[in-house]
């Protein structure tokens, strides 16, 4: 299934002439196209506008049919800029939805929403393509096994573990470290699990997309010398793209991931940065199509659009797609319809806190706000569950005491509460960790901490064995042995100063 119609040497399309329509109206990225009676395209069909602009430059714009208006007219949304289009231009109905290349040929490459490579590394093998609109797997195909997906990040593995084949939301406002955490996860998963990842950059900064690409080349996730050996495919629809492209780029990335799951029978990681921008683009398109806005100005079809994307992200008997989605929270308000709708689909939430980021604790994951359906004794085991609950209780007690400390000071607390506060502060710092992808900024080498090692470290803090160590020894270290070594170094340094 090809995305664009082929053209013969004379420039005449090989598609039937009767599939030609004409542009009747252009309003920004929305086109109204008139077709001959009885030749109306279906909803979601790809339309191609070919011609020349006023300067004589060739134009090739792909659109997607969104509405049938009556009077033999359809309304379509453009996937690229509509500059230079004029009324009366020919429009070709391809007779099929947008289709994108899939399979091993996509690894190590950057694509746009149409599945066209944008990395200047030459054409991509398009012998295998999938349409971006597909139905979710049937009930009987779904896999219901529960197992944990180890990330090597202490705070995540201990307090809000990810489910293999699950959906995880990364919640946070602007500038608290969502994209850095995603880059670390891609790095850890490629190195520790050898899995294939697909990254969908939905409506984010072009600079960040470029930084991510360079970072992946440096870390070897993208193999420059042998591109097919790469572990990730990138699909970008950035902030400067029209809303149609930003609304569909998530589906393009998902379609590529589905091929690895269904045909190659692999476990795949799908990163979407940022799912809020998908909703935002849908809202823009909805307004352009003239639909009445719903709560807070969002589109009335918000739940349907989100559901059609999320239901395709699942585990089947063939393989799994584990999805990690960054969710921008407008004005840090978790009750906004966009994050609230996303919550309903998630197995785990990793909430990033501005307060922790301000303290310099990275990753700034809020240990009390982050949740996971996997944190149950029958899934993770009694030892992991009990340690996680005790860590949360200690941190919760510290949070309750903070007002008293602010007004009266630490000395007014009971002996037991003072001990709890001291341990909570150590735990808070031990939940920080140096990242591989942040080595350039921190100067500390990155650390991957296994789950057993993480549990052992927190048990030692909770048991009181490390009560004598200074709290700064626990800051930005990997496992607990590094913390004790750091404490000895700090002690030696202070002795030398004396």
From Swiss-Prot:
Any one GO cellular component localisation term in the record: chloroplast thylakoid membrane
Enzyme class: translocase
Task performed by this protein: Produces ATP from ADP in the presence of a proton gradient across the membrane. The catalytic sites are hosted primarily by the beta subunits.
InterPro entries referenced in this protein's UniProt entry, alphabetically: AAA+_ATPase, ATP-synt_VA_C, ATP_synth_F1_bsu, ATPase_a/bsu_AS, ATPase_alpha/beta_chains, ATPase_F1/V1/A1_a/bsu_N, ATPase_F1/V1/A1_a/bsu_N_sf, ATPase_F1/V1/A1_a/bsu_nucl-bd
Subcellular location field: Plastid, Chloroplast thylakoid membrane
Source species of the chain: Lactuca sativa (Garden lettuce)
Protein name: ATP synthase subunit beta, chloroplastic
EC number(s) per entry: 7.1.2.2
Keywords attached to this entry: ATP synthesis, ATP-binding, CF(1), Chloroplast, Hydrogen ion transport, Ion transport, Membrane, Nucleotide-binding, Plastid, Thylakoid, Translocase, Transport
Catalytic reactions of this protein: ATP + H2O + 4 H(+)(in) = ADP + phosphate + 5 H(+)(out)
Coiled-coil regions listed: none
Pfam families: ATP-synt_ab, ATP-synt_ab_N, ATP-synt_VA_C
GO MF entries: ATP binding; ATP hydrolysis activity; proton-transporting ATP synthase activity, rotational mechanism
